[in-house]
Amino acid sequence: EEIGLVWDKIQPSKKKFKIKKILKKIDNFKINKTLINFINWFSAYNLVSRGMVLKMCLGDRKNAIKIEEYKKEKKITRLKFILNKDQKKSLEDLRKFSNTFKVSLLQGVTGSGKTLVYFERIKEILNSGKQVLILLPEIFLTNQFKERFLQFFGFLPAIWHSKVGVKNKRKIWQSVINGNLNLVIGARSALLLPFKNLGLIVLDEEHDPSYKQDEGIIYHARDMAIARASVENIPIHLISAVPSLETYNNVKKKKYNYTRLVSRYSDFPLPETAVIDLEKVSLKNNHFIADETLNLIESFLEKKEQVLFFLNRRGYAPFLICKKCGFKHLCPNCSIYLTYHKQINKLVCHHCGKKIKKEKI
């Protein structure tokens, strides 16, 4: 047996061909016209068949089976945190386009309280009876975000990504399409969930390159999220401390609404920073660190304090690719590329620490 989807009505054809018999109609399996329009646009823009996009949207065909659904959350009365003056202004800027399509960029330095601002917007959308989708660039961020969400709202959101179990995915899918699940936090694939009454999309860390999918159906989740918001005629909020060049350019051209948090929450000071240009500093033989940096490190170590180094790259190669078939090794836990470390001859995940021995390279 196969599950089919009625896509459109056409005039009867005079051609003779066999048509499979319809065994039954699935009552709790219905996609609205808005999502159909988005799938058509997604397919044409990314040069991929509608069938492949539908497969991403529908997932396991057993989604149609009657299963336990999420209970609809009650209205949220208030948050536990109070917004400061700058945050209130940014919130008002985001509210300007509440019931229509508009891309808004919320920019702010790290620790400025951007999350608090869009959490307040989410509260308003949820209380209006509509659904909200929050997109995050990496799978491992969803669990961290889940705890933060629980702290603010008092209930756990649904999490959607490739590592979520089939049973839970079916539960989320059915609850989303029936409108009983109001909020989903997920990675790229959550963008194609069949929401019944979507009211807002939030794309956190919009600058992150992980939003671009390079395998299978190739697309950029940020651009597709904007397209879906346009089709749904709802606002979308892009959140970032360091916006992408594309987003920044659209702000400059007045295409996007823009608001910014210029200071950290509770006026917490930024750390002191200094730039040492190695092209202007003479280094000693076999040294790759300037004397000024070494002296500073020694001063902290003498006080029994710690020093943390951030390196721009670890490992011999950021990923391995097969010349014949194009296969790339992904971490089974995090779904990111494994980095090849030549000294230990292993592929290593820099997120979870997973190591895979590679005999022949």
PLM segments and residue spans:
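Structural signal for conserved beta-strand scaffold positions within catalytic alpha/beta enzyme cores
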Residues: 8, 159-161, 238, 260, ...
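Accessory, non-ATPase domains that flank or precede helicase/AAA+ motor cores in DNA-metabolism machines
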Residues: 1-240, 247-248, 252-268, 302
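Conserved helicase/translocase motor-coupling segment
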Residues: 307-361
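A polyampholytic, Gly/Pro-enriched intrinsically disordered region
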Residues: 177-184, 279-285, 357-359
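Residue-level detector of flexible, active-site-proximal loop/helix-junction positions
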Residues: 13, 164, 243, 265, ...
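Conserved interdomain linker/interface between the two RecA-like ATPase lobes of SF2 helicase motors
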Residues: 227-324
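Residue-level "hotspot" positions that anchor or transmit function at local structural transition points
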Residues: 82, 213-217, 285, 322, ...
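Glycine-rich phosphate-binding "P-loop"
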Residues: 78-79, 103-110, 210, 273-287, ...
